[in-house]
Structure formats: structure tokens, C-alpha cells
Amino acid sequence: MESNMGSKNKIYVAALPIVDIDFYSAQDVLDAHLEKAQKVGMVYFSTSNRLNYKKAQKVAKVLLVSKAFTYIADVVSYTYFATKTTPLDAADYAPRIFSNDEDHHWLKLANIRPISLDELNTFEMVNKKVQAQYNGVGNYIKNTGRLQVFYATKTF
């Protein structure tokens, strides 16, 4: 049997900033998603952020980030709508406060858990210049002035 000990696995990750929305704080937004995921096993996270459709299709995990918290989740499915839309099963999987939202990007997430900045430093920014400047995703989140969507990889 051939061994593949030398080969490495690489996963792609997208970081999505969680921000205040209308009357909801970033923490409220996170909590609503955590509650729904706990109830039904998965949750929709929708965004109109400028996600790159081609990159987003390759993403295995998502980081939900703010200055106050960082979480990681598995991507169960990713759906892109050219025209902002609500998926048919949004009522089943989106937090109630967002189940009528129309958005371009809908990611169905599972296994959402907190992740430390130290553990995040085992991920590398795809942008080599930013990676060289911050030396890890955790350092970037902690020290950058403004969080935006970014992509990272982890090799193991």
C-alpha cells in the first residue's frame, strides 16, 4: 500500500466580519446564529459582503470574527444568488430575525465553536503581504484597524 505521509492537506477558510446590524449588536447577531445552530444542527449565515464566488466555493470553514470574539464553523453548503434572494429553507435554518433577509451569499454552517487567537495563528493569510506583516490570522484580527472579508489557509 502506498503511503501519502509526505502529502499535506490544505483547507481554505473565509473570514466574515460580524458587525452591528440595525438594532442588533455583533454579539446579538452571533448569539442568534449560535442558538439556531444548537436547535437544528445547522444555521444559515447570509452576507452581501464582497465574497469572491469562485473562492467561496472552495471554502471548507468560515471564521466569524469581530474585535470581541472569534468563532470557526464548518461550511455545509454555499449558495450564491446573482440577485439578492432568500433560500426556500431559510425559515428552517436562518435565525428568525434574519429569515426574511435577501442576500447574495448564503452559507449553511455547522459545528460553530470559539477559536483562540493562538489557534488562529496556525492559519495563514492568502494575501502574502498581509501574512508577512502580521504572521498569522490571530495577530491580524487582534491588530488590524478594520476587519474585512479575507481568505486564509491551513495546512496539516
PLM feature segments, named:
Residues 48, 59-61, 93-98:
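Residue-level detector of functional hotspots within protein domains
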Residues 58-65, 74, 108:
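Short, hydrophobic/aromatic-rich beta-strand segments within well-structured domains
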Residues 1-58, 65, 122-156:
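Compositionally biased, charged N-terminal/linker segments
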Residues 70-156:
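Aromatic- and Lys/Arg-enriched surface recognition patch
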